[in-house]
A protein has these predicted regions:
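N-terminal accessory segment detector
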Residues: 1-144, 163, 168-178, 182-185
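Active-site helix/loop of acyl-thioester processing domains in fatty-acid/polyketide metabolism
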Residues: 144-159
Length: 185
């Protein structure tokens, strides 16, 4: 059994980046970076929700997952904008947040995108995707929720309309998940 990561601290202060804290006055788990209450979910929880969506809505479930991610990504982007940090600091924080929240490890060209003004279709690579490892091998892309999160956050932070398509996925047998941001005109 793997040793637990030091992600939970009792009543940590605002400088406690990279951790989830328990607010001792409320007993609730919080993200001190985004200043939001959090809940921890496991792979079975996500798989159960996903499987029920697919059994109820068939192929429409992927659109629902994408829309849910889009909404969350937009809210995350707005929350990060409120922090009055430079775009580079915001993007670095977003990448770190991916690790802290357990999404996986991001490799993105976002810093280059900000500096060069977004040309082409940037790829966002996600290693060890929580969503893909939760579902297992299916032979198709499965990270619709993450694609929505990437699109939503990018729209807010880069102030352009995007769709995000997952082209590579662990569920298809690829070594990592890869998403392409496509600007909408």
């Amino acid at each position: 059994m793997a040793s637990p990561l030091p992600l939970l601290k009792e009543d940590a202060d605002e400088t406690s980046e990279g951790v989830i804290v328990r607010n001792t006055s409320t007993g609730q788990l919080e993200d001190p970076f985004l200043k939001l209450r959090v809940m921890i979910i496991d792979e079975e929880f996500y798989r159960g929700v996903r499987d029920k969506l697919y059994s109820s809505f068939k192929s429409g479930a992927s659109a629902i997952l994408y829309a849910m991610g889009l909404g969350y990504g937009e809210l995350m982007g707005l929350k990060m904008e409120e922090m009055k940090m430079s775009k580079i600091e915001v993007i670095r924080s977003f990448i770190d947040l991916g690790k802290t929240k357990g999404y996986g490890k991001f490799h993105t060209p976002f810093l280059k995108m900000i500096l060069s003004g977004l040309m082409g279709e940037p790829a966002v690579r996600l290693e060890d995707s929580f969503f893909a490892t939760s579902v297992g091998k299916t032979g198709k892309t499965e990270c619709f929720l993450m694609a929505g999160i990437i699109a939503g956050a990018s729209q807010v932070l880069l102030q352009k309309k995007f769709s995000c398509i997952e082209e590579k996925c662990l569920c298809k047998g690829d070594e990592y998940c890869e998403f392409k941001l496509k600007e909408k005109y």
